[in-house]
């Protein structure tokens, strides 16, 4: 690695340690000061908390810290400062780091493209606001500028690679963007918390987080410290942390502006009283109403609403700019940092140390609201991500989020051609109408003078549309009891809810066709584990075929078809399980040419690396493992693979063992015979079912996979133990209960073994109980070869169907690295040039998107940039770059065009 890059990496890691791992209690108690952290304690912190140094000795960490201190001393002349050997000044450390990563160009702070990956890591740990305000403070002082009064910059910094920027200016589209996670919700939440610290709903939700059974495994002090859960037990609850931060903030703001702050009646020694409150949570709680009154007096002195009292402390405000709302916090950070970097200070050293404690408190609170750790798993991510609703419940915050997530990106980035905004549908047509109308109202400005005017909103209208995404739920059915068969099929209540939502969407489209034209697609998101694509099959087929509404006179009016996309293959316990989920989504939901798959990581991850990363051990429900074995056998038999015979034999032996455990041990032969005889009797007058004959059922692997194909049908059709359609039901309802597209031979439904196995899968409680038991499997080479072959077959099947994959680099980087992002295994045209390399790749149309840009502190342009830079850093075995820059840009340009072409608006 280049020495300069190594140095910046060390600065990033040490900054993470000093801003994220130091216990604020030690700072408030005076044991730690921002400008004199001993080198040996910083080294111990590196050794104890940083993955980069987990295999390094304490002496090696001390050498790293000493080298950083010496480099800081070497820069003293440039920065007009005097660094001390053996000690670290955390803000001077930060200034040296940002000076290497950022630059100022035409008055705007940009990220140096060559260091965009370092910047991404820094932002992930401390956020953008601190380093950005530090950069502006440093540069303004360097150029002798007076204190700035404008702080309304974008919350995602741009980079300075002009050739790449020129490529992106040709037009880009974001077709995978969740609305409420695509704005800086922590920043908005923080303002709500800092302005309402006494008996507010936001504080009550902090207490709710404290009550939740969740803790984060990390150290918070220089000497080993405590986890947040341990801090809570010692009185450091999230409520207390927020109140401490709010007290420090209002005190320092008043000091910076020379305003009287009446915290102690007529006394003037506010600092001592503030320190007493910070050291005594009980006393702080007693005074909290008084402190809130001071905040309120600063916030609304003239009765006019202001989201943040700090906005009152500097220059003219431009209320038309939604980024203005963050200016108060930025002014506060900038002003204190500027004071710290100046020779003559307004704040005392103790007060400046309070600012360091404020930052530590803020970051400690942030890790409870935003995923900043490296823990893998969609369940962990969603547990934290859903907390945004705790702090954004008021209408003003929701309107602000809509403007920040949709309006501003479209207004500020003219080459952002299109946004696909994903929202959760309501339970009724009226709820859905109201929700969409409110979102449209927010974009249109609602007639408020500070919001976009009508012409502006009209121009934006054609550049975004909505996709309704259903959310998954686990099956909570009660499987206890002595009866072998139950009356409810799998996910019974959840399927009923889905059907209700589906009919509501139909009714919404029929009653309000003009507004319904703003909705162009449907999707499914959230945890995959425990909720398979089969549960969404009927509602997807129904909505995908819906095409007519009515006008104001009751006449039929054609509507654009609802296109389909589906989050799949993103979260799984077995790579084979993720691949099977992709196959089920395609086949059961009838995804067709032009439809999309969201994430689909299972399609493009290296099976050998994935299983090795799991130490060749997988743990999953027995039913899922049995399904995976049968599906793998089916997939690799469809497409010839050389040398796969041994793998087939292995799968057959696994199937025989687990099929007996899950099914045969829980099926009564006499009962089975009665079901089959009942079917024969009922079918006696049905010509199309003449092949259905009662006989002793001998179940084979072929029967099992055929029964798996029937899972795309509605389970109600198999309630009797065989397939039966109630002809008294209207055709419109029956039409979508049967999956017509998967089966080339519909007579499979009338094979007793197949229909009975599907019936047993849904209604046999003993099978469901046994199948739900977890098994731990040691993965053998034959299994991995099977997965590898099935993955290849599925990749080319997806390509042949004309489906596309929505890639979200930062969202999925915890699964892989940027450089080895699996998108290149789906599409490599432009990166490679030999016929074998090109034909060996399925060349599936892919796109680059943001997913949850507010969660991952990214933008669409930044997503392209991190992928480009990561590919540039790859080296071949000879040490030379694996790809030329022109190859990378050619490949990205092709992806850019494909992303634009994947719009759901093209149906008219």
Regions found by a protein language model. Give the residues of each.
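Metal-cofactor-binding active-site regions of metalloenzymes
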Residues: 1-908
